[in-house]
Amino acid sequence: MRWNALSHIALSAVLLAIPATTLAQQKVLKYAHFQPARPDQPKHAAALAFKEHVEKATGGTLQVQIYPAGQFGNDAVTMEGLRLGTLEMAVAHDGAIAVVYKPIGVLGIPFLYDSHEHAWRVYDSPWLKEFSDDMIKKTGIRLLGFADNGVRHFTNSKRPVRAPDDMKGLKIRVMPSPVFQTLVSSLGASPSAIVWAELPTALQQKVVDGQENGVTNILAASLYQYQKYITLDGHVWSVHGYVINERFYQGLTAIERKAVEEGTQKAMAIHRKMTSDQDKNAKEILGKVGMEVTVLSPAEIAAFRKLAQPPVKAWAEKEIGKEYVDSLFKAIEATQR
C-alpha cells in the first residue's frame, strides 16, 4: 500500500511538471514556401510572423513547422502534398497553384491594375471568397488570401527595351504556363518554359536572353548577375496565394482556426509591404546592383498593353472559362477609384 501511494504521488508530480499543451492533442502545421530562410525575404519574414502568432494564440496546441526554400519539394510536389494532406499549408505563386487549379491563370492577364493598392482592393473584395469556394470544391484546397509576388518586369542581357519592337528576337524564359507564353509571343519575343530552380543556370549559360519576374525574385536569386537590362513595364501583378488543406482546416478547433486566419492576415501584411517597398524603389535598388533600368511612361506602357492584353484575355476566356475572366474584370471595375 505504501509503495502504491508513493507511486501515485510520483505520477502526480510528473503530470504537474508536463505543460498542459502536451497533455492536450497537439497538432502540427507544416508550412512551405520557396524563398531563402532569411528575414529580409518577404515570404520567410511572413512565415516567422505566422508561426509566432499561431503558436501563441493557441497556447501551443498548434505547432508550425516552416519548410523554406523549396525544402518540401518543387511546385508540383508542394501542391500535390496540399491536395493529399501530406502538407498542411503553403505560400505558393500563381504558377504553382495552376498545377492543381487552372482558373488561377486568369491572374496572369497583363496590365490589369492601376496600382498595388488597386490590386489589393480586388484581392480583398468578395471576389476572393467566390474564387476560394470554387477552389475548395475543385481541389480540396482553401485560399486564405493573396500577397505580392512582385510586379513582373522584363530583363535581358542584350539591350534596353523601351517599346514592343525591342522585344523582337529575344528568347525569354517564362513559367511553364500558356498565359505567359502567350504574353511573350504577343510582344514578338520567343517564350521558353523553364522552371524556377533552373533559371539562374539557364541565364548564366545563355540558354535564354532574358526572363520576367518581380524585384523580390530578381534579388533573391541574384539574377542581376546575368541580366544587364531591366524594363519596368509592370506587365503582371504576380501573386502568392496563402493556401491550406481544407480537411486540415475543418479539423481545427474554433480557436485554432481563428489563430490561422489572424496569423495569415499578419503574414500577408508583412509580405505585401516588404514586396511593394522593393517594387516602389526598384530603380534605385536594381541600379545599385549594376542593372541598367528603363522606366516607361504611361504612353509607352499603353503600347505594351495594346498588344499583350487582348490575346491573353482571349486565351483565358477560351481555355480557362469566360465566367472566370468576367468575374475578375467585374471585381476590377468595382474597385477602381
Question: Model-derived features: where do they sit?
Answer:
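Absolute protein N-terminus
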Residues: 1, 24-25
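Bacterial N-terminal signal peptides that target proteins for export
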Residues: 1-10
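Cleavable N-terminal signal peptides
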Residues: 11-12, 22-23
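N-terminal secretory/targeting leader peptides
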Residues: 25-119, 127, 134-337
